[in-house]
């Protein structure tokens, strides 16, 4: 009996070793996350390893970048300093700026799922005093073809409530009926501020509460927090504007300015956390498959849909964020399985060199099967 047991154990060991060798031949090995615990699994893929460094190091990159294939990190590149004393890490968090809009869109669709909102609802149902509100739908706010526009406002002080922000929007936003009628697209962040105000109105909760409940708790995100959080729990980077002569100027926006970015750019996230969240929105894990398609899938020749642009050759979704010394980029397949995520805490004045490198890399990486 013992002889058979030993033989069986020996066969199992042989199978395990053989499987491990096959994995090595394929170039994929699991990486331990004991030092830098990330939201998604990391593996070493010899085919992809080094691509990010080769491309981004030429830009004097300061930040964190990851390549995703089959929902796993297959390459990463970290460079530069997060603060005056700390280096950037894979778990460092960065202000994601406009990359937050796709997340706000997800919060809107979550309320549609709950029956509290319809994409066809007119805005005057919630904010009757907003110019043009009786002509604009929730869907048009999401896709930025509402006919609304608003110049960038300057704020002082350390506090700004949602009610005060809404008053500023109502007093300063402009509605162009001809633009609305033509369906012309115009990038106007105020659309997402209005959506965020509507979310707070219909739920009785703050935007932050909705974000925490829908995303952070559900997906167990550990490296995600708001810019105005008093108790900073993540390895947060400072944002620097880099001048042509190389001088770095640390950015420190006042509290009112941070609060004015409601739903459009007030969240800090690590690159792995951000990928996990956006992929979970696109693949239906958070919203359901049908709702995710209805919200995000581009229609016809439309380039912008609920916070994401569309690249056609090859086909993938993307977004860019700039502000307060940060520059962020995401390029992701529609099913969320492949992605390029690049977060930097160096915003170089008058230079889009980092974006060009990200685009070049993404076209190759996302363009093959």
Residue ranges and their predicted role:
Residues 2-6, 14-69, 73-77, 256-369:
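Catalytic loop of the DD-peptidase/beta-lactamase superfamily, centered on the K-T-G motif
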Residues 59-61, 85-140, 178-187, 262-265, ...:
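Short active-site loop at a secondary-structure junction
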Residues 68-83, 159-168, 246:
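Short alpha-helical hairpin
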Residues 70-72, 84, 146-147, 231, ...:
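Solvent-exposed coil/turn segments that connect beta secondary-structure elements
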Residues 96, 100, 104, 191, ...:
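Hydrophobic (often cysteine-bearing) scaffold residues that line and stabilize catalytic clefts
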Residues 136-316, 320-322:
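Short, surface-exposed loop or secondary-structure junction motifs
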């Amino acid at each position: 009996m013992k002889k058979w047991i030993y033989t069986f154990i020996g066969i199992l060991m042989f199978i395990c070793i053989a499987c491990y060798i096959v994995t090595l031949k394929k170039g994929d090995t699991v990486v331990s996350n004991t030092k830098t615990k990330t939201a998604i699994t990391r593996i070493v893929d010899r085919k992809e390893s080094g691509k990010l460094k080769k491309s981004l190091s030429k830009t004097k990159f300061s930040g964190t970048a990851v390549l995703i294939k089959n929902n796993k990190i297959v390459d990463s590149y970290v460079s530069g300093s997060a603060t005056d004393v700390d280096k950037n890490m894979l778990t460092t968090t960065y202000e994601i700026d406009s990359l937050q809009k796709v997340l706000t869109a997800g919060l809107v669709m979550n309320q549609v799922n709950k029956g509290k909102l319809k994409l066809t609802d007119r805005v005057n149902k919630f904010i009757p005093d907003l110019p043009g509100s009786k002509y604009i739908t929730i869907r048009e706010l999401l896709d930025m073809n509402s006919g609304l526009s608003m110049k960038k406002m300057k704020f002082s002080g350390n506090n700004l409530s949602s009610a005060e922000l809404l008053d500023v929007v109502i007093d300063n936003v402009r509605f162009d009926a001809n633009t609305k009628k033509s369906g012309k697209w115009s990038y106007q962040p105020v659309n997402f501020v209005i959506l965020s105000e509507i979310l707070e109105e219909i739920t009785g909760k703050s935007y932050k509460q909705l974000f925490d409940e829908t995303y952070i708790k559900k997906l167990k995100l550990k490296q995600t927090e708001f810019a105005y959080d008093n108790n900073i729990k993540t390895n947060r980077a400072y944002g620097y504007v880099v001048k042509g002569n190389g001088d770095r100027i640390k950015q420190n926006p006042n509290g009112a300015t941070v609060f004015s970015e409601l739903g459009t750019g007030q969240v800090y996230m690590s690159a792995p956390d951000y990928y996990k969240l956006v992929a979970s929105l696109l693949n239906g894990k958070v919203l359901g498959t049908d709702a995710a398609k209805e919200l995000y899938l581009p229609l016809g020749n439309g380039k912008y849909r609920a916070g994401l642009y569309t690249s056609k050759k090859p086909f993938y979704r993307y977004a860019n964020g700039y502000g307060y010394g940060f520059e962020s980029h995401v390029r992701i397949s529609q099913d969320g399985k492949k992605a390029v995520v690049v977060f930097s805490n160096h915003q170089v004045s008058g230079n889009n060199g980092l974006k060009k490198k990200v685009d070049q890399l993404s076209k190759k990486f996302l363009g093959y099967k």
